[in-house]
């Protein structure tokens, strides 16, 4: 049985500003020593987006700055144990559940495992990248967050020419294009997700067996026996192109024999 990779436990010290700074510094030090990247200061760190862009145009207008890069996905530690599903959230995560019936998923005559609804861990990614809701639409906000600083627009990661979409400006003309980041709800031309990995127990000779209980030695992972967005992409390591868990030339052959 392949075990689900557990989400990192957020330390309660993260509620304290001083400790957040120290922990961030420690994370940067560790990542420098190991050669690994960090979400801090990356495109998924909405608290650092303003500094990285070199402008003061986004927090307070485009999205809310909650003071911690973790809470845009992870449940704040002061809400540890809370059930986000009771409030319309994705099970185990701090994002609202997308309208899953809206997705057109990949299908094929050769696909044995038909999936109707993405798993929670992939819904987490889609809740931003399908472009249907604001990137800061979290179920819980940190207790330390000042609601008077809430954003005016809560922009969506959507390439459309609408005031509520990032694509209004990020169109490749006024600013860099976000088109590749906006997946939409039609996923028929994307790699299938949330299906059981066919290489388990040598079930299909066209797929490689996993190396260990978490997936493969090169970092490609299996979650609850399934292939998910996070199987190939590692949001916590932005140093690799498009957040891949291994090099692009070796990614496909990690699973596929041909």
Predicted regions span which residues?
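C-type cytochrome heme-c attachment and multiheme electron-transfer modules
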Residues: 2, 33-71, 75-258
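Bacterial N-terminal signal peptides that target proteins for export
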Residues: 4-23
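Bacterial N-terminal signal peptides
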Residues: 23-31
């Amino acid at each position: 049985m392949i075990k689900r990779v557990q989400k990192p436990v957020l330390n309660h010290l993260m509620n304290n500003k001083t400790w957040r700074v120290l922990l961030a510094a420690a994370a940067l030090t560790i990542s420098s020593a190991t050669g690994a990247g960090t979400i801090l200061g990356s495109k998924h760190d909405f608290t650092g987006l303003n500094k990285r862009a070199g402008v003061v145009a986004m927090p307070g207008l485009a999205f809310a700055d909650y003071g911690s890069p973790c809470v845009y996905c992870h449940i704040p530690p002061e809400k540890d144990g809370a059930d986000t599903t009771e409030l319309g959230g994705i099970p185990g995560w701090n994002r609202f559940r997308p309208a899953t019936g809206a997705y057109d998923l990949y299908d094929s005559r050769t696909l044995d495992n038909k999936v109707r609804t993405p798993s929670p861990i992939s819904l987490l990614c889609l809740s931003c990248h399908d472009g249907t809701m604001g990137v800061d639409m979290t179920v819980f906000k940190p207790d330390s967050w000042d609601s008077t600083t809430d954003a005016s627009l809560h922009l969506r990661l959507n390439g459309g020419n609408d005031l509520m979409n990032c694509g209004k400006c990020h169109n490749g003309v006024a600013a860099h294009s976000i088109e590749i980041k906006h997946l939409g709800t039609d996923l028929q031309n994307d790699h299938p997700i949330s299906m059981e990995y066919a290489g388990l127990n040598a079930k299909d000779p066209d797929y490689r067996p996993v190396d260990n209980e978490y997936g493969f030695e090169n970092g490609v992972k299996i979650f609850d026996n399934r292939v998910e967005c996070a199987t190939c992409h590692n949001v916590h390591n932005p140093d690799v192109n498009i957040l891949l868990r291994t090099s692009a030339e070796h990614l496909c052959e990690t699973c596929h024999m041909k």
